[in-house]
């Protein structure tokens, strides 16, 4: 019987469904090992030829006069190309795997690639571009009323974040860097975030719309997520506290995102800064992972298993094995995710210095309770203590304990973690249905959980009746 073989690939998502780009990747029925190798070699040759063509074609093509901007004070397409190609480590526009942006009659385009302008008719669940737009400063000034404080929605290590409205009506988040931040390390993080975001596309990852690097202005334009971050929800700053079913759904969304980064991209991507404040929440209480300034791509060299690098991350979330060896792997993200699971269950921050000394490290405190069969005592005081919620708390805490083991080799992969979370979800649903059958008035948690079932984003190869990701 013929076997199925495939080339691992990033998946493109539209309306919650994953699609494959048939122009570059395809499923192939293979009858023998020799045929599989031939198909693999042929695919590699085609991709290499395509890359060479793009580099030569885009590198030599000249702009027509009508394709240049006429707006005063705005950079030309040639300037934009120079900015992009002038970056250290990114020698040409094709370094992004994308093409250089041009603007003609108000419509954004890319040479040699498909592009859909993010107009008012475009669905928020669809990716509206195939690469980053290089904005002009004038465009971003108009979008934010000259960076008015009225439009300011946040501030962080990068700088100030504004809510903006592009010329075509698209609402975006505009991250403007602090000018006194500029240094070699910071500039690397700025460029790294753009480079990483330009290579990924997933419903549970914040989308990159574009950027600006002109003079002393450094700006990143990303998808606007309207409902704050997970930490704000756990602190009760965003209205009603999250119920257990909603917390589980958010954990699954983050697991989806990390599984994609580790498994389905061309080269595995390690986020390196998974924490509650980097998990943005939509109005439908779905999660999107943000902030890729620290992200790293694992080498494409055969056999590469880690990156030797300076330690980066947030206190309380950093993998102790990474701290000890300076070797970064995807299991470092797994450790951070385990800390995040504990944070979701308890509502506490990873480190709380105002608590008694033995309870200051939230993970250690929670795992002591688990060892004493007292998992219910770690639950956020605002969570309802029904049967389903208590069972989920214990199962998620056991899963978190696997993620935060000191030795990375014993930690599960994100793919397996996602499978276990789906199993917990199915069991919770069954418990709720059984409870509601004997009690005509279901809890609000039951309603919120079942009601979200039809609205969830799908992870590739995971369905309610499946036990694994293939």
UniProtKB/Swiss-Prot annotation:
Main localization of the protein described in the UniProt heading: cytoplasm
Positions bearing Phosphothreonine: 309
GO process annotations (BP): response to abscisic acid; response to cold; response to hydrogen peroxide; response to salt stress
Region called Disordered, residue ranges: 1-29, 65-128
GO MF, one annotated term: ATP binding
Cofactor names: Mg(2+)
This protein's GO CC annotations: cytoplasm
EC number(s) per entry: 2.7.11.1
Segments forming domain Protein kinase: 147-423
Biased composition (Basic and acidic residues): 65-82
Family annotation (InterPro entries): Kinase-like_dom_sf, Prot_kinase_dom, Protein_kinase_ATP_BS, Ser/Thr_kinase_AS
Taxonomic superkingdom: Eukaryota
Polar residues composition bias: residue spans: 83-98, 108-121
Assembly, per entry: Interacts with calmodulin (CaM) in a Ca(2+)-dependent manner.
Protein name: Calmodulin-binding receptor-like cytoplasmic kinase 1
